Amino acid sequence: TLEHEYKVIQDLGKLFQVEDKADSIVTSIRKRLTDLQEQASREKDKPSVMIVQYMSNKLVNWGDDYLQADMVKKLGGRLLLHTKGYITEEEILKQKPDVIFLMVTEWDYDKKENLRSQLLHTPSLNSLPCIQKERVYILPLYEGQYSGVRTAEGLEHVAKGLYPDIR
């Protein structure tokens, strides 16, 4: 959760005797979250969301217990599935997400656009509005899970995916 990230940053600040810097980083992230939440609150539509990742060429759904899910929920998105596990294309079709965030790990950063394209061009998913409107957004693991000082960047990416006009 975001609270966990704040604690990690502050704990590291204590460990390295830079508590003021850590507090400043946490304050900055909290301020950015508040700003994004204020903008999101003015949006009429609260998009439904799935967070997925390719693992061994199969899709895995990320559940509630992860930072990126907390980001989605704190910004007004509606997470459709709440447990982590492999998911079929049929299950994605049933959920009809407005937005899909595609988690990409460090060993896949160089092919992130190919992975996004693979999802966008999966024939069985082409009836989904999020596929037709290309509302599939890459979320690097370093921004959406154990993000630490990059938490604000992760929040911004999630906010832009949920509400494209947000600043």
Q: Can you say where each PLM-predicted feature lies in the sequence?
A:
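Second-shell loop/turn segments in exported
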Residues: 10-25, 56-61, 79, 141-148
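Basic- and aromatic-lined ligand-binding clefts that recognize polyanionic substrates
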Residues: 21-75
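Alpha-helical scaffolding within the catalytic cores
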Residues: 31, 86-91, 119-126
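Structural recognition of the beta-strand scaffold that forms the well-ordered cores
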Residues: 48-53, 79-81, 100-103, 135-139
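Interaction modules related to DNA damage response and DNA replication/repair
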Residues: 73-90
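Proline-aspartate-enriched helix->loop->beta-strand connector
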Residues: 88-105
